[in-house]
C-alpha cells in the first residue's frame, strides 16, 4: 500500500467518496459556494465524512496544485493480487482486457491512462513496484477519481506478470515502433493485455522478446511518436471498437 496521501479537486474527492475510499478528512475553503462544492457537501454529509472550513492559505500550504477549494486526506489505496484478479475476471465470464504499464513514471500520465482505462472497460492495470509512478494527489486528480474504480496490481517484475497472463490464456500485445505490424491489423477481440512503455524508452527490450505480438500506430506527420497516455487511448479504443 502507498503511504497516506492527499487528493485535491472537488470532483476527484466526490469520486473517491462515492467509490468507497476511506477519506479521513476534507478541508474546505471558507465561503466556497459553487454548485460543484454543494454537491461535495451533500456527498460528505451522506457518507458522514469529517470536514472543516479553513482559509485558502491553509489549502495552499497543503498542496501547491489547483485544489479548487478542497483537499482531502485519504487512507492508502489497496492494490489487487494479479492472479486472484485474473481468476475473478474469467469466472465472471468476461473477455479479459488488461493494461500493463512498463515503468511509466510520470504521475499525470499515469492518471490520464487510468482515466482512459476505466472509460474503456479495462479489467485491471498492472504496474511494476520499482520505477513506476506512485498513486499520489496528481495521479488521483488527473484520473478524475477513476483510480478508485479500477483494480490496480503491483508486481515485482513485469515479465512475471506477462508469463502469468499468457499461462491464463491471455494474449500479450506490446505497443512499440519496433515492428512493421499496425495495431489495426491484429486481433484485440479476445482475452488480451496491452503493454505500454515508459515515456522515454518505450517497452523494455527484454519484455518485447516475450510478448505474443507487437503493434504500432500509423504516423503521418514529422514527429514520430505520441504522448504515452494518448497512444494508450488509441490502443484501448481500438480494442473497444473490435469488441463492439
Where are these predicted regions, by residue range?
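RNA substrate-binding interface of SAM-dependent RNA methyltransferases
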Residues: 15-21, 50, 87-181
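Structured adenosyl-cofactor binding patch, chiefly the S-adenosyl-L-methionine
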Residues: 14, 19-20, 141-144, 205-244
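Short, acidic/turn-prone active-site loops that include or flank metal/cofactor-
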Residues: 31-32, 56-57, 130-132, 199-201, ...
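Active-site/ligand-binding-proximal alpha/beta "capping" segment
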Residues: 173-227
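Glycine- and other small-residue-rich loops at beta-strand/loop junctions that grip anionic moieties
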Residues: 5, 29, 102-103, 128, ...
Amino acid at each position: 500500500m502507498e503511504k497516506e496521501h492527499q487528493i485535491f479537486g472537488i470532483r476527484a474527492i466526490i469520486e473517491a467518496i462515492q467509490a468507497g475510499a476511506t477519506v479521513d478528512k476534507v478541508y474546505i475553503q471558507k465561503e466556497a459556494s459553487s454548485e460543484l462544492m454543494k454537491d461535495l457537501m451533500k456527498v460528505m454529509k451522506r457518507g458522514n465524512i469529517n470536514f472543516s472550513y479553513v482559509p485558502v492559505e491553509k489549502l495552499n500550504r497543503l498542496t501547491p496544485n489547483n485544489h479548487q477549494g478542497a483537499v482531502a486526506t485519504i487512507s492508502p489505496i489497496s492494490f489487487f493480487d494479479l492472479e486472484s484478479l485474473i481468476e475473478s475476471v474469467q469466472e465472471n465470464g468476461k473477455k479479459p482486457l488488461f493494461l500493463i504499464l512498463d515503468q511509466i513514471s510520470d504521475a499525470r500520465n499515469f492518471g490520464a491512462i487510468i482515466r482512459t482505462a476505466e472509460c474503456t472497460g479495462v479489467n485491471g492495470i498492472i504496474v511494476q513496484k520499482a520505477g513506476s509512478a506512485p498513486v499520489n494527489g496528481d495521479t488521483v486528480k488527473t484520473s478524475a477519481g477513476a483510480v478508485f474504480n479500477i483494480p490496480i496490481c503491483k508486481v515485482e517484475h513485469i515479465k512475471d506478470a506477462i508469463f502469468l497472463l499468457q499461462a491464463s490464456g491471455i494474449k500479450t500485445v506490446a505497443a512499440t515502433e519496433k515492428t512493421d505490424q499496425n495495431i489495426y491489423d491484429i486481433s484485440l477481440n479476445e482475452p488480451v493485455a496491452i503493454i505500454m512503455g515508459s515515456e522515454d524508452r518505450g517497452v523494455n527490450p527484454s519484455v518485447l522478446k516475450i510478448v505474443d505480438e507487437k503493434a504500432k500506430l500509423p504516423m503521418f506527420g514529422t514527429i514520430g511518436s505520441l504522448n504515452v497516455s494518448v497512444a494508450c487511448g488509441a490502443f484501448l479504443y481500438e480494442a473497444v471498437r473490435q469488441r463492439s
